Design a protein with these regions (language model features):
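Aromatic- and charge-enriched surface segment that lines or borders ligand/interaction sites
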Residues: 72, 108-163, 195, 283, ...
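Extracytoplasmic/peripheral linker and loop segments enriched in polar/acidic and small residues
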Residues: 48, 353, 412, 426-441, ...
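Ligand/substrate-recognition segments at binding pockets and active sites
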Residues: 246, 360-362, 372, 389, ...
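Long beta-strand-rich cores associated with HINT superfamily self-processing modules
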Residues: 536-561
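Structural transition elements
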Residues: 239, 328, 334, 345, ...
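Ligand-site clamp/hinge motif
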Residues: 223-233, 255-303, 421, 430
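N-terminal lobe/hinge region of extracytoplasmic solute-binding protein
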Residues: 58-117, 232-236
Length: 561
């Protein structure tokens, strides 16, 4: 899967997104203590957690950045989660239980019942924990002013990719247009109180505010490092950044002043970089590493599952995610809706699933299974080469056309997109396939008039369809550096999205998001191809291992036996 951050999940019930927003959680940030058998979504050991030891994880690519204001790749967020924290986080549990919001640096999740949310849904009040400090060498207490600085820094960054999530905060628009010196709707009332005011109710706001973009940073540390801050991260989390050796490793060490008693369990996390998934699997089986950040290679899954020793260490779950083919509407011939519709009929999704040894599910709509708004059984575009050829003829291309097709070099993408290339050739479209490194590809996708068509992956940030519409289909994201790789947007969709975001009736809101799918399907800026399944492994020396529905692999909760 290409370019972004990751989200793992057992399929979440459609009503879950709204249950999350009403949760009044009493627990603080904390870990699971084990229980359950290996190879399931229960933690990997019933042993009592122990302190000490180093955990090594493998990844093919290194982060694009470790600055929470701008980072949005898979590995970026997994490493940042160990370093930085925000007001809230998701419960450290597998499955649906892990999609529940709990307090982190705030003392509770705001709700109407506890007085943290106004009855009209417009104002949220967060009370900070006292005594939480930034990591060494800053070593000072975190205050509400730090959260205001961090939020405004993120919203003012020219490279911030997710500002569209927070445009509902009063004053955000004026601040971004440099018509105001601050965001008036984000106030530090006193040292321990933050008050956020929205222009209209937004049932997804707490989930959006829990993303890494809103984690707190220390102003003096950011100013000390300037543009190099992304290589010198510092937050309040359980692990401290030690070093980043490009192309080799990133090392984090235990935060001795971490605020949560007894955490973390590990002394060190060693992220080993640049290992291909097959090489990483061999290193895990020889005891050199402890977990596969990129998962078990699909070609090796049958062999691994046939061996009882390794099968017991395998963890698998569907992702609330989609792999698409984007088509850049700024570039010919993809500015023609009939061409986009034609290619939507041309791709054989079932073949893509077979090429991944069943580690995916065919998909014919724009929300993944498990995301509110997904409609079971709904097919917008199936596999019909004859219909594709007819639409191409209707568009003035009876003999097809030549174009470029792009993907990254991460297995299994080159093989999958060779299959797509063959499908397009079968309807007369001669696509020259070009692969490039993940980070290069990610950066070029956000550059206007650069990539004509190619692979694009989107993974759940939080369980609400606004996490799909805002980044992928909105005007705000169809900008340089944005996530809307097709650069398509529609005034009609913008109006529907604005209306849905202000709705307080969960059922009516989801119905509105379902209607958006129909409009998107008619314009076909992306071709939904498949929904991936994640399969990974840990070593037999790893305790507490499970796959989190949001954070995926989460060493902040594991220990070494």
């Amino acid at each position: 899967m290409p370019p972004r951050k990751t989200r793992k999940s057992k399929t979440l019930a459609p009503a879950l997104a709204f249950a999350l927003l009403l949760t009044l959680a009493l627990a603080a940030c904390g870990g699971t203590s084990g229980g359950g058998s290996s190879g399931s979504q229960s933690p990997s050991s019933s042993d009592t957690p122990v302190q000490g030891g180093t955990m090594s994880l493998s990844y093919l690519t290194e982060p694009s950045s470790l600055d929470p204001a701008v980072a949005w790749n898979i590995i970026d967020w997994q490493i940042e989660h160990a370093i930085y924290q925000g007001m809230l986080q998701y419960a450290p549990k597998p499955g649906d239980a892990g999609a529940v919001l709990i307090p982190c640096l705030a003392t509770e999740v705001p709700s109407v019942q506890n007085g943290g949310m106004s009855a009209d849904g417009l104002t949220y009040t967060f009370t900070l924990r006292k005594g939480v400090t930034f990591q060494p060498p800053v070593n000072r207490e975190v205050t509400a002013q730090d959260f205001k600085y961090s939020f405004e820094r993120m919203m003012s960054s020219p490279r911030a990719p997710a500002t569209s999530f927070y445009m509902g905060v009063v004053g955000a628009d004026a601040f971004m247009k440099k018509k105001a010196a601050e965001i008036s709707g984000f106030q530090a009332v006193d040292d321990y109180t933050v008050e956020i005011t929205l222009k209209s109710p937004d049932l997804s706001f707490l989930n959006a505010f829990t993303m890494e973009f809103c984690d707190v940073v220390a102003r003096e540390w950011v100013e000390k490092w300037g543009k190099q801050f992304n290589r010198h991260p510092l937050g309040t989390g359980p692990f401290i950044f030690e070093k980043w050796t490009p192309g080799q490793e990133i090392v984090l060490t235990r935060n001795p002043s971490y605020w949560e008693p007894g955490k973390p369990y590990l002394d060190k996390i060693d992220y080993q970089l640049s290992f291909s998934p097959p090489t990483a699997l061999l290193k895990l089986q020889s005891g050199e590493i402890d977990a596969l950040g990129d998962g078990v290679p699909p070609a090796d899954i049958p062999r691994v599952m046939a061996d009882p020793q390794w099968k017991a260490l395998v963890y698998s779950q569907p992702l609330v995610a989609i792999s698409y083919m984007f088509m850049n509407v700024q570039m010919k011939p993809f500015d023609d809706v009939k061409v986009r519709q034609a290619l939507s009929w041309a791709i054989n999704r079932d073949k893509l699933v077979k090429l991944q040894a069943g580690q995916a599910m065919s998909l014919w709509q724009f929300y993944p299974k498990g995301m509110p708004g997904h409609e079971d059984g709904k097919v917008f575009y199936g596999y019909d080469p004859a219909k594709a050829r007819q639409l191409l003829a209707d568009a003035g291309y009876p003999d097809g056309f030549e174009t470029m097709l792009y993907t990254d070099n991460v297995d299994p993408n080159p093989k999958l997109w060779q299959s797509v290339q063959a499908d397009l050739a079968a309807v007369g479209v001669k696509a020259d396939l070009k692969t490039m490194s993940n980070n290069t590809y990610y950066n070029q996708q956000g550059t206007p008039n650069t990539l004509t068509a190619g692979s694009f992956g989107w993974w759940m940030d939080f369980p609400d369809p606004s996490d799909w519409i805002g980044p992928l289909f909105s005007k705000a994201s169809a900008v340089p550096g944005g996530m809307n790789s097709s650069f398509w947007w529609s005034p009609a969709l913008e109006a529907m999205f604005t209306e849905a975001q202000a709705m307080t009736d969960p059922e009516a809101r989801i119905a509105k998001f379902s209607a958006m799918q129909q409009l998107i399907s008619e314009e076909a800026p992306y071709v939904p191809c498949y929904q991936p399944i994640q399969t990974t492994m840990c070593s037999e020396n790893t305790g507490g291992f499970f796959l989190h529905p949001v954070y995926q692999i989460d060493p902040t909760q594991y220990w070494k036996k």
